[in-house]
Amino acid sequence: MAQCLADKRPIIYMRFASHEPLVKPQPGVTIYELNPHKGFEAFTIEVRELITKEGREACYVFDCLSELQAAWSADLMMGNFFRVTCPYLFELDTVAYFPIIRGGHSFQTIAKIRDTTQVLIDVYSSPENDLYVHPLKMWNRYSETMFLAHRYSPQTKEVFTLTDGMEASKFYALAGEEAQAAPDRNTDSWDRFFAAAQSDFRQGTLTANTCTKMCNMMITKDPKMREMVKRYFEPTDYFEVRNHMVGTGIIGGKACGMLLARKMIQLQQPGVYKHLEPHDSFYLGSDVFYSYLVANDLWTIRIKQRSEEGFIDEAPALKEGLLNGSFPDDIRERFMRILDYYGQAPIIVRSSSFLEDGFGNAFAGKYDSVFCANMGSLEERLDAFESAVRRVYASTMNPSALEYRRRNGLDRKEEQMALLVMRVSGSHYGHRLFMPTAAGVGYSHSTYRWSDSLDPSAGMLRLVAGLGTKAVDRTQSDYPRIIGLDKPLAQTNQTWADKHRYSQHNADVLDLEKRTITECNVLDLADLFPRFAQQAVFEHDREAEGRLRERGQFRPVLFASCQGLAENREFTTLMANMLSTLERCYEHPVDIEYTVNVGKDNEFVVNLLQCRPLHLLQSGKRIDLPKLLQEDTYFSIKQCAMGKSRVTPIDVVVVVDPFHYYQCPHIEKPTAARLIGMVNEHFRNTGKNCLLLVPGRIGTSSPELGVPVAFADVSNLMGICEVASSEAGYSPELSYGSHLFQDLVEADIYYGALLEDRSHVYYNPHFVERFIDITAEVLPSTVTPSAGMASVATPSAAMASTATPSATQQSAKASSQFGKSASYEKTTTLVQVFDTSSSSLTLWHDLRTNTSICGLQKNLRE
């Protein structure tokens, strides 16, 4: 320091520890007070920003790095901090001093520090107040006595090389005594803490403070979740998690929710708990994610992506890096132990980030989960497992996840990805298929009331045959079974034809031969299912079978409706009790994911896979619905909408023309999704309320069934209406329980379905023709096919009510052409945008009666 001051080089003191200050305030010294308890990422980025600010050739003094171990609970993250900070200091031609307590850290951590630093020196103090200095690494320096121990005399301020045998023996005796007194340095401080906690538990001296520390450092950072974990967890629960953990850090929201829910059921409903499958999950701690970033030199781009300007723009590059990184040998060894444990049982690698499944933010479907068939040699299984981990890590850069974080004010919050590794619940069918009998999602409180007689507080199940992906994704022509738990047999479809049509036609299964998820016709599973599983999942179409018998044909006509499970009162009662218990324990509505496997005599087991607080629609005050003239009504619907009660003026109406969308070639149908995304971005932060009308299902993965938007494409809209068109085969689905619906709820986006042949539905598609068409102002004149989109030409002038017939009118005239071979015109009005801000167009929705009206009322806004 004296030399730096003499050279007039700035001295920067990074102050973050509880020990006495190493540098006193004085001219030429800048002191920064830092808080490592904000977390590794926030702390590390703050330090880097300060280093950038101070510039080149500065001198730095850091507090003792060992204090970071206490703040972050593990040596690993302290080592990671040094590995990303030291090279940056070197890059700026600085001099930096980092003290660390010898003997308090694992050999592995010190080895990483030694590999990174340019100079490493051991310092010892003797009882005689002599100081011994032992250089361990001197980069680009060498002398014959450099790496011998040296003695420094505080009295004479002289340094002597220990070449004398007597002097050297004193030093080695001192070093040996310290080594014997140090803790086991073959283990991390994390492991030493848990070993001590288990020892205290066996001796009956474990304290509540130690349990709290285990919760805080390993289970969750969510304050509400922490309180519940401490209320329900026993010490052995913490130890069990640690024994199944790879690395250090937090296990994340999804893992925490699953464990907590199972513990609540175990303690509060032992009868229900007997029907739960035991779990033997593993957890990849959140620190492994950061270590992966550091080990693959991705930290710099991570910092760029964390910035406001790079949050979206830098994501693709970081995602690419995450997909192509490699894991340290010690982590790969732990991965192999997991695979050895599971043998050849299929497993799934699930995201379990800091922010997932907590109060206020569900992150439903934002991050990936990857199934592993777990077949082949150990090397093949390890490659597949590592690939799955990389994919989930990379999904943190998914556009929908980033948009969700930005919309909910989470873009500046620390987000680490932990992982939950679970055995896939199910049975083998034939030689290659694996799946549960059924799976789905459940809600302790349902706002989807297709009948006034249903009790929302009784809860609801969304149930499919096979893997549960069909229950949470909007796919092709599949309709999950909806079960209101107060009236399990109540259905929206009354005729056999409707029951058959609006049922599940395809199932997701794990193909062990192809080692991937595959979709198959659900009827192909009927012959593979044992009789008791058939009875649980499949239902006979008695009407169709009767017609066949009249023709002399005797064969069953089946469709998948999970009717047998709906009729199983023990199952529906158990699920109702489970959901109500979890809601009571959470003191908040919840939703769950689960599987069901059935056996003989109506026996069954349920695997509780996930539980999280449910973002519930609030009814608010009762809305007085206006009585509008028919010519002033755009649409009115009952029992076909979702969203909180509201009276909202509408500034913009966006319409996807059903005829042109139908005629659009399959490969170019994503045009509509792209254009909707452009409209969504155009009106971001403008304060304008935009209402979107689309044919069929919004957000489906099958473009022929609807527009395949992601949530990021509609995140700024006020409302969305799905429009039925039987001629084109477009049919809305009120997908309560899908990930997209959860996004709409959290974003407070209204959803309505304009169904056909319903007495309580009125819809006038020509209504928007009276408004000004502003498509040309909002959308580009063309969207080129080279980007995977069809060309789209917009009108050259605003359209009034007396202008050329709109796309809506053209659709009406051309309705007879649906299903016929009609050429698709590349230049067409696929999406139209109408300015309604100067009118009194308003949406009224009353959640209590589930009634919506959209239309004009004079002077509404005055």
PLM ranges: what are they?
Residues 103, 220-221, 225-228, 232-271, ...:
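Conserved mixed alpha/beta core segments that line enzyme active sites in large multi-domain catalysts
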Residues 54-74:
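Conserved P-loop NTPase "ATPase switch" module shared by AAA+ and STAND
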